Amino acid sequence: MSTTSRREPPDLAALLRKKKEEEAAAAKPRFIPKKERERLEAEKKAKEEEERKRKEEAKPQPNGTNHNGNRMDGIQSHHNHNPQRNIPTGPKAMRYDDDRGPNGMSNGRDYRDNRDNRDNRDRNQRGAKRGAPNDDEEKRAKMERNDEAELRARYMGPVVNQSTFSAKKKRRRTAANKFNFDWDADDDTSRPFDPIYAERQEPLVRLGGYEMTEEMVMRKAEAIRRGDPETGEERARQYLEQHRRIKEMEQRKNLGKHWSEKKLEDMKERDWRIFKENFGIATKGGAIPNPMRSWEESTLPRRLLDIVKNVGYDEPTPIQRAAIPIALQARDLIGVAVTGSGKTAAFLLPLLVYISELPPLTEYNKNDGPYALILAPTRELVQQIESEAKKFATPLGFTVVSIVGGHSLEEQAFALRNGAEIIVATPGRLVDCLERRLLVFSQCCYTIMDEADRMIDQGFEEPLTKILDAMPVTNEKPDTDDAENPQLMSRYVDGKDRYRQTMMYTATMPPIVERIAKKYLRRPAIVTIGNAGEAVDTVEQRVEFVSGEDKRKKRLQEILNSGQFKPPIIVFVNIKRNCDMVARDIKGMGYSAVTLHGSKTQEQREAALASLRNGQTDILVATDLAGRGIDVPDVSLVVNFNMATNIESYTHRIGRTGRAGKSGVAITFLGPEDNDVLYDLRQIISKSSISKVPDELRRHEAAQNKPQKGQKKLEESNGYSGKGGSWN
């Protein structure tokens, strides 16, 4: 044979590469047409039918032959021509002796096992004859192992607890036939060199809430320039200008800023809602203006703002923020605010703006009465309001006069001889002046009722009604929607008088107060600051269960001697005759003390308050007479030597401290006689953020449920009755 016809040896690398390609092609999913699938299905069914027929032909017959008449075991004769016996056997009678049990009976299970072993051995021997010549040694070794196993089973018994586990039976899974769900690199159609995908384009359509960046804006402007050589430059400039204006508008809206960082014109409804929540302002009524955020943003005249700054009012209180804008629109107002919230300035400043627009008092009109009237329940509160009003009215040239009991009518008539724009009075003494023709209200068009609920509690409903009925009716507001229109209510009636404006400030709204408000106020705006009847958060409330006068005096001495509280200090008692007793004991402790109750004359009351305010006296011992409306600066401690008979009086007592944003402490002594108010006391303390309800009060039986019966009242408990208790 020549060298040209000689076969070249196969290339191993080529074979491996070809095999890998075939495997990869087989692993990849391939689409098969429908006709091809039908043909393959028919071929598969034909093969299965052929295989089934072949198996039926090879199935053995009952006589041990197949369909061809041959023996299934390959033996053609009944005689065994195997000349070799591997295992020697004994006589037939003794061959199965070992298989018998103790009673001479054979063990059927062992007999069957040995018979099976012999059949296997004979079958192996017969199969050895049919094996290929190159498998003789392997088969001979296998037969020897079987013979050894048979001998062991015969003479040593069967193997017990032999594991049938075989490691060869474990099949290892290969990844050859595992389906690959990933795309092959050849299937990628987004080729980098494709010009379509060479430069990615940003979509111009955006979903809601998407903000275009400066880079995208410049890119779009550049695309406009390239796409339109003629007018592209101008269009791109207009597009950038439009984007700049939109951005400025968004910055003006800027909902993310806090209301304190925004300008007044940028405030939205959401900002005003947050503002009111921050200051605890709640308003009710139609056409109510927004509160003022600062003094500078109010519509008060510049001259009045300068006076406010000189007085020391840096920031308005919540009631001032809400009430002043409403009052400046000539609206009737009901203010419900906690004690010590700055109500006095809230109604004084709009009052001064109102009367500054009226003609000044002259010799011709000074006898027609004042322009404004302020009513208060107690003499001390009247004098306090008068003092506060003079701070603002005197620089503006207005006169303020107080009319209270305890002074002679001649003295007060002399004070009114030159007329007064503002009169501050108690209802009782003011009715006396009206009945004696010392005063008229012919031109009074501004009325303020401070502590209206307190005036009703003291029995001033009838005097209050007489005073309000004495007001002129020609300038009374209509009870229609026009009363809510600030433009209409700011006009003059018949060219000379303005519409009458009435305001009422109260801590609670009992039915009598509501009836008066409904009768004399027209479509009022209602302003509520915080929760009515609750103590301010600047007062830390403490309660102690101390029964007996002696124990309470001893505990009071311990508190005063602790050095934690500086003067002035106020001690409240329920019965006015106890004032002098407690004051005498306090003086025995080494402290100066004065008393204030209904039996004191007006001169004594004024002297007591003046000595406390001036620092000449350390401690004031008083009944509820001083518990409401009295403003003594820097009171550090209030001691309720006797718990008030109702929770409203308790609230006003402790309101004497913690005023004007300062902190204070209120300590209350409790006894068995106070069970009727323990439930309300627990509730009001639990609502305070700086106070803690003591365990003894929390577990007390009377503090668990609100009492059903009426509250217990002590004789002369309020300090207003008895000799010398007249308010006039």
Curated annotation (Swiss-Prot):
Record motif Q motif, residues: 293-321
Keywords associated with the record: ATP-binding, Cytoplasm, Helicase, Hydrolase, mRNA processing, mRNA splicing, Nucleotide-binding, Nucleus
GO-annotated biological processes: mRNA 5'-splice site recognition; mRNA splicing, via spliceosome
EC number: 3.6.4.13
SUPFAM superfamilies given in the database record: P-loop containing nucleoside triphosphate hydrolases (SSF52540)
Gene Ontology CC terms: catalytic step 2 spliceosome; cytoplasm; U5 snRNP
SMART domains for this protein: DEXDc (SM00487), HELICc (SM00490)
Regions crossing the membrane: none
Keyword Endoplasmic reticulum attributed: no
First-tier enzyme category under EC: hydrolase
Subcellular location: Cytoplasm; Nucleus
InterPro entries tied to this protein: DEAD/DEAH_box_helicase_dom (IPR011545), Helicase_ATP-bd (IPR014001), Helicase_C-like (IPR001650), P-loop_NTPase (IPR027417), RNA-helicase_DEAD-box_CS (IPR000629), RNA_helicase_DEAD_Q_motif (IPR014014)
Superkingdom of origin organism: Eukaryota
Motif (DEAD box): 450-453
Location of the region described as Disordered in the Swiss-Prot/TrEMBL record: 19-155, 692-728
PROSITE patterns: DEAD_ATP_HELICASE (PS00039), HELICASE_ATP_BIND_1 (PS51192), HELICASE_CTER (PS51194), Q_MOTIF (PS51195)
Catalysed reactions, semicolon-separated: ATP + H2O = ADP + phosphate + H(+)
Residue ranges occupied by any Helicase ATP-binding domain in the UniProt entry: 324-527
Primary role: ATP-dependent RNA helicase involved in mRNA splicing. May destabilize the U1/5'-splice site duplex to permit an effective competition for the 5'-splice site by the U6 snRNA, resulting in the switch between U1 and U6 at the 5'-splice site. May also act to unwind the U4/U6 base-pairing interaction in the U4/U6/U5 snRNP, facilitating the first covalent step of splicing.
Family, per entry: Belongs to the DEAD box helicase family. DDX23/PRP28 subfamily.
Record note on quaternary structure: Component of the U5 snRNP complex.
Protein name (database record): Pre-mRNA-splicing ATP-dependent RNA helicase prp-28
Source organism of this protein record: Neurospora crassa (strain ATCC 24698 / 74-OR23-1A / CBS 708.71 / DSM 1257 / FGSC 987)
GN (gene name): prp-28
